[in-house]
Swiss-Prot record:
Record key words, sorted: Signal
Name recorded for this polypeptide: Leucine-rich colipase-like protein 1
Gene that this polypeptide is encoded by: Lrcol1
Pfam families: Colipase-like (PF15083)
Range of residues in the leader sequence: 1-25
Coiled-coil boundaries: none
GO biological process terms, semicolon-separated: digestion; lipid catabolic process
Source organism per UniProt: Mus musculus
UniProt key word Methyltransferase: no
Cellular component annotations (GO), alphabetically ordered: extracellular region
Length: 161
């Protein structure tokens, strides 16, 4: 009966290699991919998923799984949160929702448009885009200020009355 010596020797060699690899690396670098999902991280290489992102308003980053398309997508603000630009929002839509100058994350329309709040009829305006009906006209020829007005005529044009 002959006993093969190779399997134990191969196992011992493999263990020695695994033990030796970290010792050959620079002392300031860590072995990559050692943190699991949910653990704190600073960069992608620390995570087994190769994905280190913020997952809340807290600036601390955590290891998270990648998307089906192998993308590493950070957490984005849900609707109703204050924002400054579209990329901060999950809906990719950061708009004014009232006369208040603050902007909030908001859902897009059924046609995937991001439409901001507009001034109602009668409100003082400086440009057509400020008004709900996209029509900003002076009340009279001598009027120093313009107001939001309804569009008129068969073709609903922005014409002075």
């Amino acid at each position: 009966m002959s006993v093969s010596v190779w399997p134990p020797l191969l196992l011992l060699l493999l263990l020695l290699l695994l033990w030796a690899v970290p010792t050959f690396q620079d002392k300031n670098t860590r072995v990559s991919a050692y943190k699991g999902i949910g653990e704190m991280c600073r960069n992608n290489s620390e995570c087994q998923s190769d994905c280190c992102v913020t997952n809340s308003l807290n600036p601390q980053k955590f290891c998270t799984s990648q998307t089906v398309f192998l993308e590493c997508v950070p957490w984005r603000k849900p609707n109703g949160f204050l924002c400054e630009e579209n990329t901060e929002c999950h809906s990719n839509c950061c708009i004014r929702t009232s006369s208040n100058p603050d902007r909030f994350c908001s859902s897009k329309t059924i046609f995937m448009q991001c439409i901001s709040w507009r001034k109602p009829e009668g409100a003082i305006c400086q440009h057509h885009l400020e008004c709900w009906d996209l029509c900003c006209l002076p009340l009279s020829e001598n009027s120093p200020s313009s107001h939001c007005t309804k569009r008129t005529g068969l073709l609903a044009l922005c014409l002075p009355v």
